[in-house]
UniProtKB/Swiss-Prot annotation:
Annotated positions binding substrate: 21, 51, 55, 69, 83, 87
This protein's name: Isopentenyl-diphosphate Delta-isomerase
Annotated positions binding Mn(2+): 25, 32, 69, 114, 116
A Gene Ontology cellular-component term: cytoplasm
EC number(s) given by UniProt: 5.3.3.2
Main localization, broad class: cytoplasm
Reaction equation(s) it catalyzes: isopentenyl diphosphate = dimethylallyl diphosphate
Protein family per UniProt: Belongs to the IPP isomerase type 1 family.
UniProtKB keywords: Cytoplasm, Isomerase, Isoprene biosynthesis, Magnesium, Manganese, Metal-binding
MF GO annotations: isopentenyl-diphosphate delta-isomerase activity; magnesium ion binding; zinc ion binding
Amino acid sequence: MQTEHVILLNAQGVPTGTLEKYAAHTADTRLHLAFSSWLFNAKGQLLVTRRALSKKAWPGVWTNSVCGHPQLGESNEDAVIRRCRYELGVEITPPESIYPDFRYRATDPSGIVENEVCPVFAARTTSALQINDDEVMDYQWCDLADVLHGIDATPWAFSPWMVMQATNREARKRLSAFTQLK
């Protein structure tokens, strides 16, 4: 895969430039654009993934299905599709926005900061997973209710962005709609 960049943003969320992704994530990470996606299978189960130990930020942490950064000129939806193919080896339904104005800042135990405007999406797949070990070290298909209960009971066991997304009432409601079989 070619070198990825992040789209830098000012405080109002307006693009101001780009920076190589690996260089962008430091102890003083500048605000940038990202996305987060929750993927459901034909049984209405959520894919929860564990980040590879080689990841710069939050290695080995359990999180929602896929996260990433849209590239210059790429829509958020196309970025979700691209990363689902790259990380999970799956085709997905068109991503649906579930939390369009999500923004967060969090620091991992090593001091690496995430500072993102991060629209959240959900999608479905019927494809068999073909996991990219450079991105994902483990995964589990779970009932959403069980995951939400786990987040409520032990938020420290999940990525901070997953916890913040899952505790938003409207996002939780929209995620629940994806558990209904179609």
